[in-house]
Amino acid sequence: MPRAWILKSRPKGMPQPSDFELVNLPAQSLGEGQFRVANRWLSVDPYMRGRMNDVKSYVPPFALGDPMQGGAVGEVIESRNPGFAPGDTVLHMAGWRDEAVIGAEAMPQKLPALRVPEETFLHNLGLTGGTAYFGLLRTAEARQGDTVFVSAAAGAVGSAV
């Protein structure tokens, strides 16, 4: 039976273990074009704290009782999608679950076989690293010899710069 971490209550200050709950989910059959992933890595990112509040922002807040959304890396274990075969390693946004049925809405990406740990695709080779890289080189147009100041409060992206 698949399991997922849900947001049980909205944190007051620092999130506490009591704000979350590990729950059993009903088993899902695969639809055409979907595949099942056994997750090996889940991402816990700074932006998630803001989504735990019930306020309007650039992304909707997490819904109480729903599985936490976020990046994950896992292995395809069953597939009805010709682009994804059992054994493929994928990055997706189905979130904090041990197993997930993936469709296009989870934005799956098959990961290349590189000599880096696969969890690297959740940070330095993922959204955080890409934002740092393109922000520094394309937006700021930093060049060799430039001095760059990165605030101590720059968060995950700043730490990747």
Give names to the regions the model predicted.
Residues 14-26:
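Short glycine/threonine/proline-enriched tight-turn/helix- or strand-capping micro-motif at secondary-structure
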Residues 1-5:
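Short structural boundary motif marking the start of a folded domain
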Residues 26-44, 52-96:
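Glycine-rich beta-strand-centered segment in the early N-terminal region that forms part
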Residues 7-13, 42-44:
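Short polar catalytic/cofactor-binding loops
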Residues 158-159:
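N-terminal Rossmann-fold NAD(P) dinucleotide-binding loop
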